[in-house]
Amino acid sequence: MLINKVKDLETGKIIPGAQLLFGYNILNVALQKDVEEVPAKHLDKLTIEDREQTSTEQRHADECNQDAERTHRDIDKSQDLRTRTLKVIKHSVDEEEVGYTIIDQFQPIFGPAIRHLQNQKVISIGAVGQNICRHGKLSWLQFATRSRVYLFDVLVLGSKVFKNGLQMVLEDKGILKVIHDCRWLGDILSHQYGIILNNVFDTQVGDVYLFSMETGGFLPHGTRTLEECLIHHLSMLPSKVSFLAHRQTLTKEYHDIWFDRPMDPTLLKLLSLEVTYLMPLRSAMLDAMFSDFTLLVDGYLNAYRRGTADILESPELSVAELPKELQQLRVLQQMRREKALKEYDVNNKGLLTRVEAEKAPRSEASGTKHDAELENVVKLTKSEKSFHQTMTTNAPLLENQTEKQQGALCQKFPVVPNCFPRGPFDYYLYKKWASNDTPTTNVS
């Protein structure tokens, strides 16, 4: 059912545009009529039944007026809290510079925006509304490229926003879409608009995958929010991304916040920043995902050229055997598992519990600049120096041990609390095992 001229009786606001309602959305239908007060001079002409009915209607009207007054007081308190929350958000996003384009009509900028999106290889997407799923309602769709941000007003434009071009972008397999938790958006697009999202990079999935890499195959007890991912993977300060937590509060407390028109500029900037940060987050995750692969290739490259001619074998004879340089990945994973079991608690489902303290941003030395560090000097802390000395002593033993023996030997290694598994220390260990050469080390 499509209805026009919709008014929210709780807030008194007029909701713009045509509203689509499904059968399960309609709980009750009632005709509204005013209760007219009967003049006192006519009361003597009424029967007892009429008097009782009139009295009942009058009491009902008084109760309605009292309820209305209480509702207005509650609304005023809610508006005050909402205003204060918006001020906090404004303070947190004021320092950030981001430009955005609002698309709330089909002419003249809708067409150029669609063409720009179609020419991209990677875009990031966000969405807000009420209960984003097949039973919910979309209000805004956010799209970001490396140079532009578009905010599509789905509430005003309606389903035509998809038919006129966005559906082609969302279903295009040649365009990678970066989304944080794509489940809800995929559900509402599929069931309400018949759109199937294709070629998605989900940063929430990426975070779980990287945690599994860092812990040697373990899984975390839960997923991270976008705010937590930005802090952990991009080392962003919590104050820089606090607006994302306030966004969740607004959405939870004020279900209609994203249906206000015109939209508060602070909220528009919030939506723009949220989708803008997804692009660098994906890049950081990809670098971390390929770190093990990069280390293996580097060790492979140096396997023969740094050794003597005596170790060279016939290529035909060695093809079927797994080289020792690749077998070191198993050792590295075993070490990570041992380290993870000492750093994390394991719940009754066998999942590792990530603690709240993990939200603190990591230092640059713990892996955020690992690409440059792999090429330059490996710097070790005092705690890592002890670990380095242990590995220097035991590295020759690891090469010829079985998996069980390697695991037992790994238990002897001291745990380094601040050693980030994706950083330069993994690189040092791998280089130590994969060759007889000791890399240049600057111990600080």
Curated annotation (Swiss-Prot):
<comment type="function">
    <text>RNA-binding component of the PET complex, a multiprotein complex required for the processing of piRNAs during spermatogenesis. The piRNA metabolic process mediates the repression of transposable elements during meiosis by forming complexes composed of piRNAs and Piwi proteins and governs the methylation and subsequent repression of transposable elements, preventing their mobilization, which is essential for the germline integrity. The PET complex is required during the secondary piRNAs metabolic process for the piwil2 slicing-triggered loading of piwil4 piRNAs.</text>
</comment>
<keyword id="KW-0963">Cytoplasm</keyword>
<dbReference type="GO" id="GO:1990923">
    <property type="term" value="C:PET complex"/>
</dbReference>
<keyword id="KW-0469">Meiosis</keyword>
<dbReference type="Pfam" id="PF01612">
    <property type="entry name" value="DNA_pol_A_exo1"/>
</dbReference>
<comment type="subunit">
    <text>Homodimer. Component of the PET complex.</text>
</comment>
<dbReference type="InterPro" id="IPR002562">
    <property type="entry name" value="3'-5'_exonuclease_dom"/>
</dbReference>
<protein>
    <recommendedName>
        <fullName>piRNA biogenesis protein EXD1</fullName>
    </recommendedName>
</protein>
<dbReference type="GO" id="GO:0003723">
    <property type="term" value="F:RNA binding"/>
</dbReference>
<keyword id="KW-0943">RNA-mediated gene silencing</keyword>
<feature type="region of interest" description="Disordered">
    <location>
        <begin position="49"/>
        <end position="76"/>
    </location>
</feature>
<dbReference type="InterPro" id="IPR052144">
    <property type="entry name" value="piRNA_biogenesis_EXD1"/>
</dbReference>
<dbReference type="GO" id="GO:0034587">
    <property type="term" value="P:piRNA processing"/>
</dbReference>
<dbReference type="GO" id="GO:0031047">
    <property type="term" value="P:regulatory ncRNA-mediated gene silencing"/>
</dbReference>
<dbReference type="GO" id="GO:0043186">
    <property type="term" value="C:P granule"/>
</dbReference>
<feature type="domain" description="3'-5' exonuclease">
    <location>
        <begin position="142"/>
        <end position="205"/>
    </location>
</feature>
<keyword id="KW-0694">RNA-binding</keyword>
<dbReference type="GO" id="GO:0042803">
    <property type="term" value="F:protein homodimerization activity"/>
</dbReference>
<dbReference type="GO" id="GO:0051321">
    <property type="term" value="P:meiotic cell cycle"/>
</dbReference>
<dbReference type="InterPro" id="IPR036397">
    <property type="entry name" value="RNaseH_sf"/>
</dbReference>
<comment type="similarity">
    <text>Belongs to the EXD1 family.</text>
</comment>
<dbReference type="InterPro" id="IPR012337">
    <property type="entry name" value="RNaseH-like_sf"/>
</dbReference>
